[in-house]
Amino acid sequence: MKQGSSSRKVNEQAREVIASILLFDISDPKLSMVTITGCEVSFDRSVCNVYYSAEKERYDQVAEAFTRASGRIRSLMARRLSWRVAPELRFMLDRSVDTAERIAGALAREAA
């Protein structure tokens, strides 16, 4: 799907705000060392898919922590953004880092 510049700005704004909230406002240790890799906000801004990465061993822990903290993150996000609607947050694991590591490992083995 093609994104316009305003859509990219909205997605980046959402990513920056959520990353800041995790860094400064959420004290759950299970959400430490989590990286927000991207956001996709729907056209009407009612839904925001939030992509994150974490260590493989912590996938389930982090998913549960996001489920518990999503309401708090949403309310803090609504305060910081001047959008009419606070979007529903859907946290999704970004497996692109895992894929990149797997490819790099395969290339390293082949080169050796």
Question: Model features per residue range: what roles?
Answer:
Residues M1-N49, S53-A112:
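Charge-rich, low-complexity N-terminal segments
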